[in-house]
């Protein structure tokens, strides 16, 4: 049973709270129970004998969702609900990411959504389409109120008393039932459009062995997001070119009906608005060919060499960015370099860099090689440097980086090579000329290169 829901930033600053009972504690009252815990804290904190506080960090927005539950048998259930609530907010506001300002300015919407989703502390409604009907957006609600006010004003202005008080009561037209529960009945759009966004995140750990890289473990996390603004009750058939990757264990939206080709052919009646059609994961370690494993890491390959130079005390980081006619540039490329063995008196000295610049960290155990907003494909950026020991210890052993953390993104192709083959639409209103758009986005998640 849910007692209260809270939203904070990663520093535990309260953004929103929803108390289901008058006895439910505020987040400020709970802070003493979670004081001193860092970002790596447990996902569950016992508050009392039969009450626990669950935490879920969702998305790149660095928002923390909290649920105070009483007598919860399954510890995964609150975390799944919090992740689902975050997804409901994403789809409700039709945003790719949520900000603190957005949540603060729409606190009433957040409370109304939770009021609709929870009944007596138990989950009741989670369908985004149904929630949009129960809790209209501000612009939709304003349109309804303005229309009702205008109609009432015209009726009072032009009708006489006999019409007002002697006419029979008009009965409203009963709308036909929904074709499917996840889609609003009788949708109408001026511009019929459907956008399919495929996003893949690279998570990999590699080790430098001589001049070659060896994959220790790696995976690709992908999802297919759809924004659908189609009139009527259309049927969509989405065909994928999977590039030989089995996607049998994908998590699919309940609207999907699989064809004989499995996830490669998906038929569905789409919800209106934004929704996640499918999520999948590709285990790179399961690929038998080593060369193909590295190919599926994407366009960016980073290597680390140590013991270079006349005194064998230099290190070099090389970034090889592959050529692609589908990708214009690599965006927000950053490489964080870690020196755990550096002394307080030592200094990191950059000898040569072909791209970007070096940013020193106050902790002195790491630095960041930061590139421009965009880096051209086909380029090979190189950074060479060394760690200078103080004059008091001139014969100290050289210090080299222990590992690198890589982050970047680009648009145009996926590391796995998966692409949309066709998007076929049927059962649209006569004369409709829908627009179809496809976008591919690649990102680096936990991408580590060890020395």
Swiss-Prot record:
GO terms for biological process: endocytosis; Golgi to vacuole transport; protein targeting to vacuole. Its main location: Golgi. Adaptor protein complex 3 (AP-3) is a heterotetramer composed of 2 large adaptins (APL5 and APL6), a medium adaptin (APM3) and a small adaptin (APS3). This is AP-3 complex subunit mu. It is a peripheral membrane protein. The keyword Protein biosynthesis does not apply. It is found in: Golgi apparatus; Cytoplasmic vesicle membrane. Disulfide bonds: none annotated. GO terms for cellular component: AP-3 adaptor complex; clathrin adaptor complex; cytoplasmic vesicle; cytoplasmic vesicle membrane; Golgi apparatus. Transmembrane segments: none annotated. The keyword rRNA processing does not apply. PANTHER family: AP COMPLEX SUBUNIT MU. Residues 191-450 form the MHD domain. Belongs to the adaptor complexes medium subunit family. It comes from Eremothecium gossypii (strain ATCC 10895 / CBS 109.51 / FGSC 9923 / NRRL Y-1056) (Yeast). Keywords: Cytoplasmic vesicle, Golgi apparatus, Membrane, Protein transport, Transport. SUPFAM superfamilies: Second domain of Mu2 adaptin subunit (ap50) of ap2 adaptor, SNARE-like. Part of the AP-3 complex, an adaptor-related complex which is not clathrin-associated. The complex is associated with the Golgi region as well as more peripheral structures. It facilitates the budding of vesicles from the Golgi membrane and may be directly involved in trafficking to the vacuole. InterPro entries: Adaptor_comp_med_subunit, AP2_Mu_C_sf, Clathrin_mu, Clathrin_mu_CS, Longin-like_dom_sf, MHD.
